[in-house]
Amino acid sequence: MPLIQVTLIEGRTMEAKAALIGSLTQAAVATLGAPRESVRVIIQEVPAAHWGVAGVPKSAAKEPPRDSKA
């Protein structure tokens, strides 16, 4: 049973996360030969203030995630 874990900065739409889950599931089926029903995907969302890039919290950045409604 493949288990795929993804960590993202919060702010993406439910539609974007559903599309990601579908795409990752299909990739596991295609590349690993895993039965679709055995693939698990976990998305963990992290607040931007808890995600640092180059020593700066991502919350300090001016642009939201590309698919964000913000």
Curated annotation (Swiss-Prot):
It is an enzyme of class 5 (isomerase). It holds the Pfam family Tautomerase. Keywords: Isomerase, Plasmid. One of its GO terms (molecular function) is isomerase activity. It comes from the Bacteria. The keyword Nuclease does not apply. Its EC number is 5.3.2.-. The active site is at P2. PANTHER family: 2-HYDROXYMUCONATE TAUTOMERASE, TAUTOMERASE-RELATED. Belongs to the 4-oxalocrotonate tautomerase family. This is Probable tautomerase RSp0893. It comes from Ralstonia nicotianae (strain ATCC BAA-1114 / GMI1000) (Ralstonia solanacearum).
